Amino acid sequence: VTGRVAHGPNSEQSGFESLLEKDYLLCLQFDASVEHFEVQSVQVPVPGHRKPYTPDVLVRYWPGPRGGLIEPDLVEVKPKDILKRKAEEFAPKFKAAAAFARTQGWNFRILTEESIRTQRLENIKFLREFRRRPQDSAREQAVVNMLSSLGTGATSASLVQSLEPSGGVDSFAIWYPVIWRLVYLRKIEIDLDVPMAEIVPLWLPNRRAS
């Protein structure tokens, strides 16, 4: 399976060679600690092999909260069953990649579906459904302004109730798609590691919920 996945507000394109790799790229796109990533940009010489080994992704991170540098990750994405079945074939490649990464000040990591296909991925896939929703500038600005006035402790439900004090059966149907689109665009933030429900804590960037 190969293809390209669009991400971000400008629909940037990244290539993938498996569905698991596609899922990992989606997770990277919503990871605030990631500065940028490069797909198959590194070739690692493997002793005894004519062809170099090309790991899937090189991930670079923003400095930590105290300004400390975070070492980049050179990442291979593989399902557990393939890793087990082809362990002998992969061993020299992974050994070479780990050694090469150390010379660059990187970490070499092997990720499987256990660490990729999580609640975070489920939430990201839900939010992606709103990426092509037509922009509604007036409502989007109203959401941002109201969330700013509510401050920390706001939830999706309290935000809608503040936008539509009179309530009504259609208020959530009207406002939730606007809110989720803004979350997808990262103009509003939520905790992606917890299940999304009708009441979801949310906040503006750099104004983390308490």
Language-model features and meaning:
Residues 1-210:
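Electrostatic, structured charged patches in enzyme active sites and in nucleic-acid/phosphate-binding
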